[in-house]
A protein has these predicted regions:
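C-terminal motif of bacterial Sec signal peptides marking the signal peptidase cleavage site
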Residues: 17-20
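Acidic, polar low-complexity linker/tail segments
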Residues: 23-26, 303-356, 363-371
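N-terminal segment of the mature folded domain
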Residues: 24-159
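Periplasmic-binding protein-like
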Residues: 111-119, 192-199, 206, 243-270, ...
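Ligand-binding pocket segment of bilobal, Venus flytrap-like solute-binding proteins
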Residues: 178-252
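VWA/integrin I-like adhesion module and closely mimicked acidic/polar interface patches used
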Residues: 245, 467-518, 528-530
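Von Willebrand factor
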Residues: 350-415, 420-466, 494-504, 525-526
């Protein structure tokens, strides 16, 4: 009953196949070993422990090549079974293996470490709320957010394992903590109402736990807390202490705690050399010295979730990380309940999204690039395609599309999730033809009056800007327009393609707390990933 919780994440990405769970493709080759190569598909949560993974491969006489992707993409890759290009997999949670590995190709699965999903709250805020002395329930968190006493960040439940884990914790708490969550629990009006309220209180969302941590550090003064892995809160606090800033106090909701189990499994293809190398790598990671090393990096190890004996400069009780307290995680429900819960999150419970797609149809986009762009937008708008990646629209979502070249061509929008209206919008995009030059700034400015027609705080609002060339126009004009419309906190997520200038897009990302995605290899995947951030 205890550990099925983590499986949850798996479902999430599975349905989604999307960005949040999406690939941050950072392939890294290992040492100088000339032995068997193991290709590992891993969640981005493991980036900080890659040196340990590489040492495990070295000790096994193997070469390790790691590719980092999101939970959904890991799940989708595992659907390929033995046809996958990877030899091993290490997602954030076993759930992703359960949901994706339909042919049971993944063998010898073992948890390498565990990390609870917690609320990291600035200590002074936690003290004012009475959370440093008393147990905290999900209802307490909801009340603090409703009262305007807690501005917090959280990843999407259909894009990121940490967001999914927190979401299931909310569901359990508001359903009265059943032994196992059921479909009938999801149908209870009071459950839906309370979940909608707490998700509507999220002040900023993202598609990646690691990126959420980085954003919190970058915009520290704007937020009071974030939902993330305990290990990420520990890493955040280490950075905050170095910066001379107030650290976060870890809050473990007593009625809605989820724990991720970081499983490592072999994609069994009948290759004796790879099987043997994998076994040595896994044995090394599970050895006592290495488990202690992981513990000292903020990961709970051992058969349970007990971190007794941990370094208290890492597991700091003064910051709420109580290594002696027994943690009681929720039990993951049946797969069909997980799937229904994630669908409800996307289509009914989450904070509505307002997404502006700013699309480059300059002359250099002619040919295959133009077709890729149109195909990507079909995935965004056609609900029959969006469903596979858990990107379905909700009845309150808003879509605004702005095609451009050297000037803005038009601005059109659709409110809600009516399939016919969304397909009409896609058909308008499909009729566009590439021509003329490139100005990425003026079309974003042209969309701002439409955005301001809506209550900004009631939506997860963002711009997704796709371009393939160096822009004319003025970045200063864009900055001034964002300031004039009080939209400087609205993220612009750029998708870089072709000859786009990274310096121009990075400048926009820094100014708006956005991010740049590389669409050169797979434009559809880049759009999926960017959409997963709102």
């Amino acid at each position: 009953m205890v550990k099925r919780l983590l499986s949850l994440a798996l479902v999430l990405c599975a349905a989604l196949g999307l960005s949040a769970c999406k690939p941050e493709e950072n392939d890294k080759a290992a040492s100088n070993n000339s032995g068997t190569e193991i290709r590992l598909l891993s969640g981005s949560e493991n980036k900080s422990i890659e040196p340990i993974l590489q040492e495990a491969a070295r000790q096994a006489g193997a070469t390790l090549k790691v590719t980092y992707k999101g939970s959904v993409d890991i799940m989708l890759e595992l659907e390929k079974g033995k046809s996958s290009e990877y030899d091993a997999v290490m997602p954030a949670d076993r759930m992703w293996i359960t949901l994706g590995d339909k042919t049971r190709a993944v063998k010898n699965i073992a948890s390498i470490y565990r990390s609870p999903v917690v609320f990291g709250v600035k200590r002074s805020v936690a003290e004012k709320l009475g959370w440093t002395k008393n147990e905290v329930k999900v209802a307490d968190i909801l009340k603090a957010a409703q009262d305007g006493k807690l501005r917090f960040m959280m990843t999407s439940a259909t894009q990121s394992n940490s967001g999914a884990a927190a979401y299931f914790g909310f569901l359990y708490a508001f359903a009265g903590n059943p032994e196992v969550l059921s479909e009938s629990d999801l149908d209870k009006p009071q459950v839906g109402d309370k979940v909608k309220t707490i998700l509507g209180s999220v002040n900023r969302t993202a598609g990646s736990s690691g990126w959420l941590k980085d954003l919190f550090l970058d915009r520290y003064d704007y937020f009071d807390a974030m939902v993330n892995y305990e290990s990420m809160i520990i890493e955040t606090n280490q950075a905050l202490v170095q910066q001379g800033r107030e650290p976060l106090y870890a809050v473990y909701p007593v009625d809605g705690l989820a724990i991720a189990d970081a499983p490592l499994g072999l994609v069994a293809k009948g290759d004796p050399a790879k099987d043997a190398a994998f076994a040595k790598i896994q044995d090394y990671l599970l050895s006592a010295p290495v488990q202690n090393q992981l513990l000292n990096q903020g990961r709970r190890t051992g058969l349970g979730v007990n971190a007794s004996g941990a370094n208290q400069t890492v597991f700091n009780p003064a910051l709420g990380i109580d290594i002696n307290k027994v943690l009681t995680p929720i039990t993951m429900p049946a797969p069909e309940v997980i799937e229904k819960a994630l669908t409800l999150y996307q289509t009914a419970f989450r904070k509505p999204s307002l997404t502006v797609f700013v699309l480059d149809f300059s002359g250099s986009m002619a040919g295959s690039a133009e077709e890729e762009l149109k195909n990507a937008m079909r995935v965004m708008l056609d609900q029959s395609l969006a469903k596979r990646y858990m990107l379905q629209a909700s009845p309150k979502d808003v879509f605004i599309v702005v095609p451009f070249d050297s000037q803005t061509r038009w601005v059109k929008k659709v409110e809600g999730n009516d399939q016919n209206k969304l397909m009409e919008l896609w058909q308008a995009v499909a009729r566009e033809k590439a021509n003329n030059g490139t100005d990425i700034y003026s079309p974003v400015i042209a969309a701002l009056p439409e955005i301001r027609k809506y209550n900004y705080e009631n939506y997860s609002t963002s711009v997704i800007l796709m371009t393939d060339g160096k822009s004319e126009g003025s970045f200063d004009n864009l900055k001034q327009s964002l300031a004039a419309q009080a939209l400087t906190g609205m993220p612009v997520y750029s998708i870089m393609f072709g000859a786009a200038d990274p310096s121009q897009l990075n400048a926009i990302a820094v100014f708006t707390t956005g991010k740049v995605f590389n669409g050169s290899k797979d434009l559809i995947s880049a759009f999926r990933e960017a959409k997963g951030y709102n």
